[in-house]
Amino acid sequence: MAIERTFSMIKPDATKRNLTGAITKMLEDAGLRVVASKRVWMSRREAEGFYAVHKDRPFFGELVEGMTSGPTVVQVLEGEGAILKNREIMGATNPANADEGTIRKVHALSIGENSVHGSDAPETAAQEIKYWFSDTEIVG
């Protein structure tokens, strides 16, 4: 498998509970390397822009409120098959359906407060990385 990069986000429900280190450790223990990271407090505009794909979904307003409720850690991860590996480590969106030992099974509070986000494909990874990071901020 090729070395690739993916986007990862530790959401406010997790940062408020001081889980940034624990979640990052789970990612690193799985063989992913953090090549960029920053802590941000999303504005409403940033959250609406980042999640624009969901703007017509019934949960959009609640999603934006949650994402602007506290600090978020945005990261670029690198490794073999990083996109799939990150999604496997995160677990199912609904923590009730997540496999044992995944981030969401261990740390998520609910489907709405599921602690993490990760890119689902190479195209979205590139788009999401570019949304939060300039090329000079990514240090391999």
Curated annotation (Swiss-Prot):
Presence of the UniProt keyword Membrane in the record: no
EC category name: transferase
Gene Ontology biological-process entries: CTP biosynthetic process; GTP biosynthetic process; UTP biosynthetic process
Pfam families associated with the record: NDK (PF00334)
Catalytic activity entry: a 2'-deoxyribonucleoside 5'-diphosphate + ATP = a 2'-deoxyribonucleoside 5'-triphosphate + ADP; a ribonucleoside 5'-diphosphate + ATP = a ribonucleoside 5'-triphosphate + ADP
Gene3D superfamilies reported for this sequence: Nucleoside diphosphate kinase-like domain
Translocase as UniProt keyword: no
Chief place where the protein resides: cytoplasm
Subcellular location: Cytoplasm
Stored InterPro entries: NDK-like_dom, NDK-like_dom_sf, Nucleoside_diP_kinase, Nucleoside_diP_kinase_AS
UniProt-annotated catalytic positions: 117
A GO molecular function held by the record: metal ion binding
SUPFAM superfamilies: Nucleoside diphosphate kinase, NDK
Cofactors (names): Mg(2+)
Enzyme Commission code: 2.7.4.6
Keywords, comma-separated and alphabetical: ATP-binding, Cytoplasm, Kinase, Magnesium, Metal-binding, Nucleotide metabolism, Nucleotide-binding, Phosphoprotein, Transferase
GO cellular component: cytoplasm
Binding site for ATP: 11, 59, 87, 93, 104, 114
Function comment: Major role in the synthesis of nucleoside triphosphates other than ATP. The ATP gamma phosphate is transferred to the NDP beta phosphate via a ping-pong mechanism, using a phosphorylated active-site intermediate.
NCBIfam families assigned to the protein according to its UniProt record, in alphabetical order: PRK00668.1 (NF001908)
PANTHER family: NUCLEOSIDE DIPHOSPHATE KINASE (PTHR46161), NUCLEOSIDE DIPHOSPHATE KINASE DDB_G0292928-RELATED (PTHR46161:SF3)
Subunit and partners: Homotetramer.
Similarity comment: family membership: Belongs to the NDK family.
Record's protein name: Nucleoside diphosphate kinase
The species this protein was found in: Rhizobium etli (strain CIAT 652)
Classification of source organism: Bacteria, Pseudomonadati, Pseudomonadota, Alphaproteobacteria, Hyphomicrobiales
Gene that specifies this protein: ndk
